[in-house]
């Protein structure tokens, strides 16, 4: 016999994150950690604050429903950026850091992002000339 699972109504990943954050007894408990040296740890509270702060900045620069191109390696800041984009009411367009120039050109021309978030100067250099056009 199948049991019905009772699930609280969560509308999206942002709500799920903040609900989990509320339920944390120790907000300083480590949530995310980078793998590269020097290692950086992010507590639930730091992550929450970073998401809110970046989201507020994104809202100043964009309109609800705009696309945001996110070019980053798999790292804690990717998670923070993605949830910030969603919280700001934007659409995340994720891109691999290993794409060729023509791939970035296609994505940028196709999605027409209002803003681009990159993980470092190396990633920025890959797309800056495309963005100028």
Where are these regions (language model features)?
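N-lobe entry segment of adenylate-forming
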Residues: 1-61, 66, 83, 109
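Active-site-adjacent beta-strand anchor residues
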Residues: 7, 71-72, 117
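Proline- and acidic/polar-enriched loop/turn elements at helix boundaries
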Residues: 33, 69, 97, 118-120
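Short, flexible active-site loop motifs that bind/organize anionic cofactors or intermediates
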Residues: 37, 44, 94, 113, ...
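Conserved AMP-binding/adenylate-forming
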Residues: 40-41, 55-101
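Residue-level recognition of oxygen-bearing side chains
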Residues: 46, 53, 77, 112, ...
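Alpha-helical structural signal in soluble globular domains
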Residues: 84-88, 126-133
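Conserved ATP-dependent adenylate/AMP-binding module captured primarily in the ANL superfamily
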Residues: 99-130
């Amino acid at each position: 016999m199948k049991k019905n699972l009772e699930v609280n109504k969560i509308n999206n990943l942002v709500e799920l994150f903040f609900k989990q954050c509320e339920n944390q007894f120790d907000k300083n408990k480590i949530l995310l950690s980078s793998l590269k040296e020097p290692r950086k740890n992010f507590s639930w509270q730091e992550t929450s604050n970073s998401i809110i702060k970046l989201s507020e900045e994104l809202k100043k620069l964009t309109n609800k429903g705009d696309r945001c191109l996110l070019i980053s390696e798999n790292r804690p800041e990717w998670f923070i950026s993605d949830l910030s984009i969603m919280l700001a009411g934007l659409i995340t367009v994720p891109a691999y850091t290993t794409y060729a120039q023509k791939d970035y050109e296609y994505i940028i021309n196709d999605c027409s992002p209002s803003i681009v978030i990159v993980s470092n100067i190396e990633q920025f250099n890959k797309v800056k000339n495309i963005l100028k056009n």
